[in-house]
């Protein structure tokens, strides 16, 4: 079936949002007189959300007293500064332009709450260009459940087999596969050191956004 749309996970796939997460964690540590942590430690757990990032930055058990207050502070700060340093990954602007020139639709399916995802898309000038934005607010079950991808395909009125879903986490590939879409795993994203995208069962694995050009071209011609 001919490819009709390309859907992306947000953090670590479409956008490099790590700089904003890292800046907030380091600021919270500094304000408490605590030493900075290696940025890569935070980057490696971004897919685990605020809970994982705060736990890593503060080397703290999520069940410990005071942890929830730190997590809520992190989210409050991120609400205010969620699009200060975030940007498209290198090569992604060109890829999106190619997708649009090819008359394909593209959109975002993320586990990031809409209160964060929408401002970022708007700030980066992507909201008007994308065909849709699916967040946990729109479904009962988030990825790895297939519901977000099923909703995306229904919203676009497309057969899942004509959709490619791109992500940097096993949950993305599981969600897409169970929804019936084609899947692509990216190695340039926020991969936990113990994870190996080659083992996720994706249809294809790439190291750079522009490598998706070949994947898309192949899907368009049915090669």
UniProtKB/Swiss-Prot annotation:
Metabolic or biological pathway, per its Swiss-Prot or TrEMBL entry: Cell wall biogenesis; peptidoglycan recycling
Signal peptide: none
Catalytic activity field: N-acetyl-D-muramate 6-phosphate + H2O = N-acetyl-D-muramate + phosphate
Function in brief: Specifically catalyzes the dephosphorylation of N-acetylmuramate 6-phosphate (MurNAc-6P) to MurNac. Is involved in peptidoglycan recycling as part of a cell wall recycling pathway that bypasses de novo biosynthesis of the peptidoglycan precursor UDP-MurNAc. Plays a role in intrinsic resistance to fosfomycin, which targets the de novo synthesis of UDP-MurNAc. Shows a very low activity on GlcNAc-6P, and neither alpha-1-phosphorylated MurNAc, GlcNAc, or glucose nor glucosamine-6P or glucose-6P can be used as a substrate.
Active site: 9, 11
Family: Belongs to the HAD-like hydrolase superfamily. CbbY/CbbZ/Gph/YieH family. Phosphatase MupP subfamily.
UniProt binding sites for Mg(2+): 9, 11, 168
Protein's UniProt name: N-acetylmuramic acid 6-phosphate phosphatase
Record note on disruption phenotype: Cells lacking this gene are highly susceptible to fosfomycin, accumulate large amounts of MurNAc 6-phosphate, and show lower levels of UDP-MurNAc and UDP-GlcNAc than wild-type cells.
Lineage, top ranks: Bacteria, Pseudomonadati, Pseudomonadota, Gammaproteobacteria, Pseudomonadales
A molecular function GO annotation: phosphatase activity
Gene3D superfamilies noted in UniProt: HAD superfamily/HAD-like (3.40.50.1000), Putative phosphatase, domain 2 (1.10.150.240)
Cofactor: Mg(2+)
Pfam families per UniProt: HAD_2 (PF13419)
Name of the top EC class for this enzyme: hydrolase
């Amino acid at each position: 079936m001919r490819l009709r749309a390309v859907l992306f996970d947000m953090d670590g796939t479409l956008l490099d949002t790590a700089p904003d997460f890292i800046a907030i964690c380091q600021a919270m540590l500094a304000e408490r007189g605590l030493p900075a942590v290696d940025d890569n430690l935070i980057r490696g757990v971004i897919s685990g959300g605020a809970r994982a990032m705060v736990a890593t930055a503060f080397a703290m058990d999520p069940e410990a007293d005071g942890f929830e207050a730190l997590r809520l502070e992190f989210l409050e700060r991120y609400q205010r500064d969620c699009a200060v340093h975030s940007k498209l990954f290198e090569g992604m602007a060109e890829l999106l332009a190619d997708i649009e020139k090819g008359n394909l639709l593209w959109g975002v399916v993320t586990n990031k709450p809409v209160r964060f995802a929408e401002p970022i898309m708007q700030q980066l000038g992507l909201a008007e260009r994308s065909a849709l934005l699916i967040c946990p607010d729109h479904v009962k079950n988030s990825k790895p459940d297939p519901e977000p991808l099923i909703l995306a395909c229904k919203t676009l009125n497309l057969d899942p087999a004509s959709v490619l879903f791109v992500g940097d986490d096993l949950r993305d590939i599981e969600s897409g596969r169970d929804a019936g879409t084609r899947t692509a795993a990216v190695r340039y994203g926020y991969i936990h050191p113990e994870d190996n995208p080659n083992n996720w069962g994706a249809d294809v694995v790439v190291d750079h956004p522009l490598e998706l050009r070949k994947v898309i071209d192949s899907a368009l011609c049915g090669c």
